[in-house]
Each structure stands twice: as structure tokens, then as C-alpha cells.
Amino acid sequence: MSKTISINAGSSSLKWQLYLMPEEKVLAKGLIERIGKDDAISTVKFNGQEASETLAIKDHTAAVKILLDDLIHLDIIKSYDEITGVGHRVVAGGTYFNESALVDSEEVIKKVEELALLAPLHNKANAAGIRAFKKILPDITSVVVFDTAFHTTMPEVAYRYPLPNKYFTENQVRKYGAHGTSHYYVAHEAAKILEKPIEKLKLITVHMGNGVSLTAVDGGKSVDTSMGFTPLGGVMMGTRTGDLDPAVIPYLMDNTEDFKTPEDIRRIFNNESGLLGISELSNDMREIEAATAAGNKNATLAYNMFIDRIIKHIGAYAAVMNGVDAIVFTAGIGENDAHIRSEIMKHFDWLGADIVTEKNEKRPVYGVISSNAAKVKVLVIPTDEELVIARDVERLKTK
């Protein structure tokens, strides 16, 4: 038996989950928020209990020490030595990492930092988490698991952009995708639920949270995905634009005071757009739906645009694969919002997909929510990226 921690490090946060492996039992999970502040918050959930404290945490290294000390204080572990492995979620692996990798050299961490060009909001923070654990637990197995790795099976026709070739060969501008660990997990879980080999299935996986992406999974491999060069591409999201005409950028630079620097573009497109930008209210779908029900026109438009973009991608991916066996919803909105699922799927009667209202509205919902007669099954599967990360730590530990 071993104890493995799955880590998702943000710029000011550290989300974690501790597993007993290979049993895959969750011993504890938690979140450290406001790293770098005097009023940071560390929360630990274990055995149906929750412990929280507010304290100063100056950086990620201090956060890791607090995390481990909390585990000892709460009698979840006896000493640091019980932790045998750590797996880190990393958003961008580029073409350099096509699978999870051991952090067995400084070069691996430096490469993760270099790839921040592809995920400026994520990779530097991911690397900070890796360095923090290396400093405090230098001898345990350390693994990096990439959001982009699952999508490295996309054919060139799907991942290339129609730009001059030199921008691909010299600057590596292409589609990389994201949320790959989530898409991988729910695709494989769907195959188990449907009791069919994943090699025989054509699936469309729909990851709907604050970030949203869809993937066409043919025979267990990603053949197309909605997010692009960065997680900004694809469908409309909580605060991100998704795809739009590139000519919008120079137009706004010429005609407004808001778009003067690349940082302005990144900030507005990543943090001020999407549901938030259209509704002028919130990036939270629950608030958007409540406002829509109350007759708020901006919220209604945001809601309908969100659904519209997802419908179009599902239809496109069914065509890309020349058919589809199942559509799988996951992540915060995908798992919890029955109305959104219903609104999306009512556009696919022609495909042979349906939703049984009683199954769809059951809470919690898990598994098939379509009728037995449906040609295309519809499923809801809670994602578990942390478990995939823990499994990869165990797999690479034994290599």
C-alpha cells in the first residue's frame, strides 16, 4: 500500500486529494486558497469531517508544508514518510510531452515552465507546485500529468491551423486542446457502463464547468477537441470568449482604448468575456439561469449562446466520426444541470438520442440517462482527474 497525493496548483491556490493506493480510496482532500496572503485559508475534508484554518501562507512551499502538517495534526498520516508519491496536473505539455512523465530532473520542471507560453495562466503555477513538493519531499516519486496529452492522437488535419507553414514549424502554433485527463477518464468510464470495448465506440465527451470543452473520441483516442492553441479556444465559457473572428482583435485595437497591449487582449478574452461578458452579471451558470427565469435579457442571451455553441460542436463531431454511439456530460455544469442537458439534447432527436426526464433529473445522477431504445446513448459521469493522476503515479512508480 502507498499514499499518493494528486495536486492541482494554481497561482494562489493548491487543490489536493490524498489516496490510499492501489485501493484507490480517498483518505482526505482539501484546498488552500489565497496563497501569498496573510489571510490564506486551508481546508481539509476527511471521514465526513471538515477542518479549516486561516493563516499567513507566503508561497507554494509554505502551502505544501501546511498541507502535510495538517495531515499529521488530523491524524490522517503519522509522518511525511507515509507519502510515497505525488502527481501534478499540468495544463500544457505541447508536443514535448505526449504522456505523463516522471519528474526525475530539473530539465522536466524547466520544460513545464517553458511551456507556459501555451498556457500562461496555468503552467507557471503548476511548476511552482512541483518545485514546492520537490523541496519538502525530494525523494518521493513525482509525476506530471498533462491536460494536453490525451489529445496528441489528433490527426494533423484536425490540429493544424490554416496559417503559413512557418508559424507551425518555427513557433509550434497548432491546436493542443485541454481537459484531456477529464475526457480520458469519462470516455473509459462510459465504455465500462455501456459494457463495450472502448476501441469499438465513438463518443463525444462534453466537459462543462467554468471552462468548457468537447472532444470527439474514436476508438479510445481523441480525434478532435474544441479548445485550441490555448484553453481560450472553442466554445463560449464562464469568462472566456471561445472561438471568434481574429479580425476582431485589430479592429478593437484601432477603435477602442481597451485593447492596447497583448495583456489587455488576454485579460478581456480570458477573464471578462463569455457568460460574464454577455450577461454583465456572473460567470456562474446557476446565477445566469436564475436571472433568465426572472426575465433578464442579457442573461437569457448568454444562456442561449452557451447552448448554441455546444450544440454546433456536438453536431460537428458526430460528422467528423461519421456517427456517434454516446454523448457524455461531465464537470460542474455537465454533472449537475439537468436543464442544460435537456436543452442541448432536444436538438439531437434526428441523431437517435433522447433523454428520459426522470433519469436526467435524479440527484445525484450517474450513468445512462437516455431510453433503452435510444440509438445514441446519453450519459452523465462525474469526472475524476485526481484519480487518473494518482493512477499514473502508481504506474510510473513501478516502471
Curated annotation (Swiss-Prot):
InterPro entries: Ac/propionate_kinase (IPR004372), Aliphatic_acid_kin_short-chain (IPR000890), Aliphatic_acid_kinase_CS (IPR023865), ATPase_NBD (IPR043129). Its main location: cytoplasm. One of its GO terms (biological process) is acetyl-CoA biosynthetic process. It catalyses: acetate + ATP = acetyl phosphate + ADP. Transmembrane segments: none annotated. Substrate binds at R89. The keyword Hydrolase does not apply. It comes from the Bacteria. Its cofactor is Mg(2+); Mn(2+). It is an enzyme of class 2 (transferase). Keywords: ATP-binding, Cytoplasm, Kinase, Magnesium, Metal-binding, Nucleotide-binding, Transferase. GO terms for cellular component: cytoplasm. Pathway: Metabolic intermediate biosynthesis; acetyl-CoA biosynthesis; acetyl-CoA from acetate: step 1/2. The active site is at D147 (proton donor/acceptor). One of its GO terms (molecular function) is acetate kinase activity. It is found in: Cytoplasm. Mg(2+). Can also accept Mn(2+). Disulfide bonds: none annotated. HAMAP family: Acetate_kinase. Homodimer. Catalyzes the formation of acetyl phosphate from acetate and ATP. Can also catalyze the reverse reaction. This is Acetate kinase. It comes from Streptococcus mutans serotype c (strain ATCC 700610 / UA159).
